[in-house]
Amino acid sequence: MNTADFDFDLPEELIAQTPLEKRDASRLLVVDKETGAFSDQHFDQIIDQLQPGDALVMNNTRVLPARLYGIKPETGGHVELLLLKNTQGDDWEVLAKPAKRLRVGAQISFGDGRLTATVIEELEHGGRIVRFSYEGIFLEVLESLGEMPLPPYIHEKLADRERYQTVYAKENGSAAAPTAGLHFTEELLEQIAAKGVKLVYLTLHVGLGTFRPVSVDSLDDHEMHSEFYSLSEEAAQTLRQVKANGGRVIAVGTTSIRTLETIGSKFQGQIQADSGWTNIFIKPGYNWKVVDAFSTNFHLPKSTLVMLVSAFAGRSLTLEAYEHAIAERYRFFSFGDAMFIK
């Protein structure tokens, strides 16, 4: 299949620039992949799609305020760093702008100078490994100096940075939010649990590759970026029990899907506690191992995320659902509306 097979025309005004005042006030397009039927609802009605004995699986990663603005003390030149992943100790892989003058040994100072970085390795495409020096606790320093790394298609300033976190965000490490989870409120999760649905958490730290366009014509030539994931023994046990009792595993978002399917693929369809790095690319023709239904936001044309949805619902039904969403003026991308596919 070709990348162009997953293209569609999206009016720019449908790209949501800010979150709605109330998280669960967003809209929900319910898609039945067996009948091909669509139903326009509001997100808080997702509870009607869940049955007692099901498991709702969410990604509890927390977005780091990973964009840092600094200067090179020797020249006064401005530098922007985007933290991608912690490689070891105080060493981080970053995306640097402008990168060409940041050679090994270059120093960068941030804020009042209580955070500094030294370039220790040069990577391709503007990537660098830097070693940070600071006083105190790194995450606290980052909270005070860093900015939220909002996606490139969002041009508005975010008034409250917590709105780019899920209410259950816990494990620091993402460069982007698992946006399907942004719609849930604590109250809605309490109602879902009270219905007899198991709430299960896993971790996948979202990398910037999530926004990277597919640059090859054939899907067979595309290589996914790697992201760190983790599923605890307690979570794995709950999911095994849900499956054994005939319940469904319902994933919130593509990051939860990719974690569960990575584990299912690794352990011959079994759900085991595991952690590691995944670069799984779920595209049409994929043989599903774990996930029975899922919620997700509306994604970019020609993205691997539209391909993932198509792998579950079929390409033509997925593109039909997107046409319906555009005609009905649904809001798209990170701060946009959601779909539930069963």
UniProtKB/Swiss-Prot annotation:
PANTHER family: S-ADENOSYLMETHIONINE:TRNA RIBOSYLTRANSFERASE-ISOMERASE. Its EC number is 2.4.99.17. Monomer. Belongs to the QueA family. Disulfide bonds: none annotated. This is S-adenosylmethionine:tRNA ribosyltransferase-isomerase. Its main location: cytoplasm. Pathway: tRNA modification; tRNA-queuosine biosynthesis. GO terms for biological process: queuosine biosynthetic process; tRNA wobble guanine modification. Keywords: Cytoplasm, Queuosine biosynthesis, S-adenosyl-L-methionine, Transferase. It comes from Streptococcus sanguinis (strain SK36).
